[in-house]
Amino acid sequence: NYRGYDVWELPPNGHGIVPLMALNILKGFDFTTRESAETLHRQMEAMKMAFADGDRYVTDPKYMKASVADLLSDRYGEARRREITGRALQPHYGDPNCGGTVYLCTADEEGNMVSYIQSNYCHFGSGVVLPGYGIAFQNRGYNFSLDEHHVNCIAPHKRTYHTIIPGFLTREGRAVGPFGVMGGFMQPQGHLQVVTNVIDFHMNPQEALDAPRWQWTGGLHFDMEPGMPLQVVEQLQNMGHDIRVLEDMSQFGRGEIIWRNEEGVLAGATEPRADGVAAAW
C-alpha cells in the first residue's frame, strides 16, 4: 500500500516485487517537489536497493530463500530506508530475515479492466520457431544464473527471474486502473516513476508518462532524459551519482495508463516515446 493506493504487480518469479520494494522504502519519505535533487536521490537509491534484493532473492518461489511477506514488510522497508544517506551508495542486498515488449491496457463501462504484457525477450526470443506455424519461442532462460550458489541458478523444472510485469492500482478495494511501462529492466523503474508521479505529484496520466525519466544502469551510473533541470543534475552529481544525459529517449521505456477518477470517468494516456495510441469508443 502506497499512500492509500494498493499497487498490484505480478509475483515472483517476475520482478514485479522490485518496484513494490522500492515504493515500500519510499513511503516513509514526504515528497513535495518532483524535480529536486533530494526527491530524485531518494528514488534512485531506493530503486538500486530494490534491484539488489531482487537479484539476490527473486527466482521460482519454490526456491526463494526469503518470502514476499518479509521483502515487503514495513520492518524491512524501514531498515532499508535508514540506509539512505545524502550520498550515492553502491547497491547491496539486505537481509529481510534479519526491449521488444508489447503492453496494452483496456477498460469498459461495466468496470472490467485488463493490464496485459507480452514479450519473447531479446527481440526474437530464443530464435527457435515452431515448424510450419511461425511461432517464436521465448528466451526467458537468458536470466538464469550459472553460479551454482545463486538462488536463481538454472535447474530442471525451474522458472527464472523475468522482467514482464503488468501493473494495476486500486484504492479502498476499488479499481483505479491498469498501467505498464515496457523495456526490460527499465520496467520496474518506469513503474516506480509513473506511480510516484500520479500519487505524490498529482500528475494526470498523460503528464505522468510525459515527464522526464531516469534509469539506473549499474553501480552508481544513471542515464537521464533531456528535460531534467541542469542544476538538479549537477546536484545529483555532487551527491556522488554518475549521471549521463542522453538525447536518445528510446531506452527509457514505453508506457500506457488508464485511470478512473472518483466520478467514474476514464482517462487514457499513451507514451510519447513510442507509437502507442489511446483510443475510446
Feature map (PLM): residue ranges:
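Internal maturation/activation junctions in enzymes
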Residues: 29-120, 132-133, 140, 247
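Extended C-terminal subregions enriched in glycine
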Residues: 40, 110, 158, 191, ...
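Structured, charged N-terminal subsegments at the starts of enzyme catalytic cores
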Residues: 1-43
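Extended C-terminal regions of large enzymes
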Residues: 9-17, 169-186
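Short Pro/Gly-enriched beta-strand edge/turn motifs at strand-loop
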Residues: 84-92, 145-154, 239-242
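Short Gly/Pro-enriched turn/cap motifs at secondary-structure boundaries
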Residues: 10-13, 93-97, 155-161, 246-250
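Alpha-helical support elements that line or immediately flank enzyme active sites
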Residues: 27, 181-203
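Active-site rim segments in enzyme catalytic domains, especially the processed small/beta chain
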Residues: 112-177, 201, 205
